[in-house]
Amino acid sequence: MLDDTPRIAVLGAMASELAALRKALTDAAEHTVAGGAFTTGMLAGKAVVLVRCGVSMVNAAMAAQWTLDLFDISHVVVSGCAGGVDPELKVGDVFVAGQWGQYLDVVMGREGPSGFEPASGIPSGYGNFGMIFPKPVMVTGPDGETERRFWFPVAPAMLTAARKLAVTVVLSKGSGAAQLDKTPKVTVGGNAVSGAAFVNNTELRDYVFETFQAGVLDCESAAVAHVAWCNGKPFVAVRGLSSLAGAGDGDKLYAAFNQLASDNAALVTMGILRAL
């Protein structure tokens, strides 16, 4: 271990997602191991380690396990931006899901006389998107038991903290070109999904909402949730909406609002840390 101080791990894919957290960090110390950068310090009254994991499921999972191996971690948090799926959510809002699934761990079905069919013997349980049939992943938990699992739960105490915070926290509307008409809100509970894809497609977004009732989607959180669950560590992901995936000028919205979304997520993340 790099140090023996009990810490909360806070992961973000990009520097912009961790910017507000790094600004608020005190007693900061940098640690580099084989190219991996970890920043320890105090944040919202808690000892933490900030980790920029990089975009993608593999990067996120690798960074999460690496952090658990190198530090004495009590809780795992992901903070940053995401694409909106639920049409009721707006850019700048923060979504704290109750569970995360890996919607692009899939079977590519064969086309038959009546349409695409999944492989025999591989359970799906969810409707398909063309040839794509989502399936559970095989996981081994901290008790050593192996099972098929689609949803990875968020720690109840961390959800409770988020719900209490949602009543009082005031999120930013931004400023200048990145200013919103209405003050964003925090939504707690429900589903969210992650996969190795930047989604700029309305049909896929609609499918994800109808099939999984997901509030948001991203490229990292479910992978970190998977690692946290296997290690028996409490987990939460806090995601600010930078765009509505595939809607209108979604890619332009992302460019304009990803920092605001990340900063709003950071505000909620720090509130949750204070409550732990």
Question: What positions do the PLM features span?
Answer:
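Gly/serine-rich nucleotide phosphate-binding loop at the start of the catalytic core
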Residues: 7-16
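Short Gly/aromatic-enriched secondary-structure transition segments
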Residues: 24-28
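Glycine-rich phosphate- or other oxyanion-binding loops that anchor nucleotides, phosphorylated ligands
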Residues: 2-6, 32-276
